[in-house]
Regions:
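Catalytic beta/alpha-barrel core
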Residues: 20-26, 51-55
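Short coil/turn segments at secondary-structure boundaries
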Residues: 16-23, 80-83
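Catalytic or ion-translocation cores adjacent to nucleophile or general acid/base/metal-coordination motifs
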Residues: 40-193
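Extended, charge-enriched "interface" segments that sit outside catalytic cores
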Residues: 1-11
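Short, flexible turn/loop "capping" segments at secondary-structure junctions
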Residues: 13-15, 44
C-alpha cells in the first residue's frame, strides 16, 4: 500500500514532491531491486529514485561491487534512464564508527567514496553521495566546510547532499545570521571541491 500511495501522490502532485527512497542497511543489489519490483507491482507509473544506504564497514567495502552489479542490469539501467542517469548513494557514519572505531570508519568511508565514484564514472552515471552525518565527531559531525573539502577527488562534482541531525539544527539554524553563514560555507565547499 505504501507504493500505491507513492503512485497516487505522483499522479496528483507530481513526481518531484517526494524525495528518494532510502534503503537502510543495503547489503546486496537485491535490496535495491526489491524496491523496484514492489513499485512496479503496485503500478507506480513513476518510480522515485532509489538510494542504497551503506552503513557498516563490510557494506561500505561491498558498495562498489553492489553498484557495479546494479549498473549492468538492464532493468536497473532503465530506471536510471528515467532519472537522467543519476544515482544517489547514501553513506552512514554512525554504524561504521561502531564497527571499526573512528579511524577505521573514516578510512572505510573515504575508500568507499573513491570506489563508488570510479564505478559511477565507468558507467557514465551522475553520482550524488548523500552523507548521513550526525552532530558528534563519532557520527561524522564537525565543521561541514572542512568535511566537504576533505572528500575524495571527483566524488562531489558539484553534487552533494547531507543530513543535518536534530541535535545540531538549533545550533546551526536558530539564528538567521548563523544559518546564512553555515549555508554559505557548505555552498562554497561544494563549489571548491
Amino acid at each position: 500500500s505504501l507504493f500505491q500511495l507513492i503512485g497516487r501522490t505522483h499522479e496528483v502532485y507530481g513526481s518531484e514532491l517526494l524525495g528518494p527512497i532510502v534503503i537502510s542497511m543495503t547489503h546486496a543489489a537485491s535490496d535495491v531491486l526489491t524496491v523496484l519490483l514492489l513499485a512496479k507491482w503496485a503500478g507506480c507509473k513513476t518510480i522515485p529514485q532509489i538510494t542504497p544506504l551503506f552503513e557498516s564497514v563490510p557494506d561500505l567495502k561491498d558498495a562498489p561491487r553492489i553498484l557495479e552489479s546494479l549498473f549492468t542490469l538492464g532493468i536497473y539501467r532503465e530506471h536510471l534512464t528515467s532519472h537522467h542517469n543519476e544515482q544517489m548513494v547514501m553513506i552512514g557514519y554512525s554504524d561504521s564508527n561502531k564497527d571499526g572505531g573512528y579511524l577505521m570508519a573514516n578510512w572505510s568511508l573515504y575508500e568507499a567514496q573513491e570506489e563508488i565514484t570510479r564505478v559511477a564514472q565507468k558507467h557514465n552515471i551522475k553520482l550524488t553521495i548523500f552523507h548521513g552525518r550526525g552532530g558528534t565527531i563519532a557520527r561524522g559531525g564537525g565543521p561541514a566546510n572542512s568535511a566537504i573539502r576533505a572528500q575524495p577527488a571527483g566524488s562531489i562534482n558539484g553534487r552533494f547532499r547531507l543530513t543535518e541531525q536534530g541535535e545540531i539544527i538549533a545550533l546551526r539554524y536558530s539564528n538567521p545570521g548563523l544559518a546564512h553563514r553555515h549555508l554559505e560555507q557548505i555552498a562554497s565547499a561544494v563549489i571548491l571541491a
